[in-house]
């Protein structure tokens, strides 16, 4: 049976106490969570030799999670991704959100969900689960409505990490939640993933961006482009520096429209760390996965977990979510959450070994 331990972490700059929630399963694999940002701090799973590897990037101290702009492992919202110029119109009313990424609103603004200490609920009878809860007030970063948000993490004996997001608001609002974990399946300290990780994405289409990193509104076939990961290939083989889209983002920072079926969960992506043999399958109820190749990561040893140094392309993100800036593109599936209706999405990260 799984074991759950709760240990003190470090206080935030505001003096708020934070904690680490460590779920360890029968095989010795574990997931560590933090109530600041309802974040994933570590995922430790066995490699092909039976050694345990931590396969997500993270910070050594709380100030990294509180202030750095990489969002390591964080729950981001109310709306992940970019909203162009922080502007949208809802029910005939114009809204101006905080602008925290050039001229755009990114991942919910300055004081987004990753910057907040969530209330954690644990139950001794369910030792493989942690529930985080947050109240986001009306006007939070410019969003309408008082919103209650819940994130439930479960880690089982099969090395499956399940994340379930739910939310409800008393006014119509925007809601698009994701987890921003950075994966390096060879181990978080093992350097670039471009030449030693294979990636397959279950998507025949992707969403192009403009030079401001906002969606153009098009949905484009991946065939004959750098973005064709319909068969497994090295991540680096998809980063064609001559491609204009890659140039805009300094790598891959794009939304892929998943090939959906009638199943509740669709396979979004599969990855393998070639050196470790650790594999990852990502299933989701969402319509897309945003793939980011850590294009602007620059974390010095005094900040990285276990004194790690993280640089460009040192990980990849599989951010399951609705389409970015959907509120400004009528052809995209909506991210509007109606008053008193329930938002619910689920993603499963399944870790295995290719021996």
Predicted regions and their residues:
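An exposed, glycine/acidic-rich loop-and-rim segment of catalytic or binding clefts
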Residues: 2-355
């Amino acid at each position: 049976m799984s074991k759950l331990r709760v240990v003190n972490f470090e206080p935030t700059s505001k003096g708020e106490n934070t904690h680490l929630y460590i779920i360890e399963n029968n095989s010795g694999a574990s997931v560590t969570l933090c109530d600041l940002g309802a974040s994933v701090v570590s995922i430790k799973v066995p490699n092909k030799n039976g050694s345990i590897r931590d396969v997500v990037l993270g910070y050594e101290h709380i100030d990294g999670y509180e202030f750095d702009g990489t969002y390591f492992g964080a729950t981001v919202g109310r709306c992940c991704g970019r909203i162009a110029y922080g502007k949208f119109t809802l029910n005939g009313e114009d809204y101006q959100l905080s602008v925290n990424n050039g001229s755009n609103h990114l991942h919910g603004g300055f004081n987004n969900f990753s910057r907040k200490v969530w209330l954690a609920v644990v139950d001794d009878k369910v030792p493989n689960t942690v529930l985080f809860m947050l109240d986001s007030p009306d006007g939070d970063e410019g969003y309408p409505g008082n919103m209650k948000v819940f994130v439930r993490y479960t880690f089982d004996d099969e090395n499956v990490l399940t994340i379930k997001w739910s939310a409800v608001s008393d006014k119509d609002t925007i809601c698009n939640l994701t987890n921003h974990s950075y994966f390096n399946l060879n181990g978080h300290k093992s350097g670039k993933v471009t030449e030693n990780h294979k990636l397959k994405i279950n998507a025949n289409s992707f969403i192009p961006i403009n030079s401001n990193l906002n969606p153009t509104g098009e949905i484009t076939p991946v065939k004959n482009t750098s973005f064709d990961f319909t068969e497994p290939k090295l991540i680096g083989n998809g980063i064609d520096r001559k491609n204009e889209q890659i140039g805009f983002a300094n790598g891959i920072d794009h939304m892929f429209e998943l090939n959906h079926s009638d199943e509740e969960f669709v396979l979004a992506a599969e990855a393998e760390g070639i050196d470790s043999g650790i594999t990852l399958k990502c299933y989701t109820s969402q319509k897309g996965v945003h793939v980011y190749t850590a294009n602007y990561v620059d974390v010095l040893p005094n900040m990285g977990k276990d004194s790690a140094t993280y640089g460009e392309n040192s990980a990849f993100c599989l951010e399951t979510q609705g389409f970015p800036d959907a509120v400004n593109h009528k052809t995209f599936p909506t991210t509007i959450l109606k008053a008193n209706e329930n938002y619910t999405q689920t993603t499963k990260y399944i870790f295995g070994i290719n021996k």
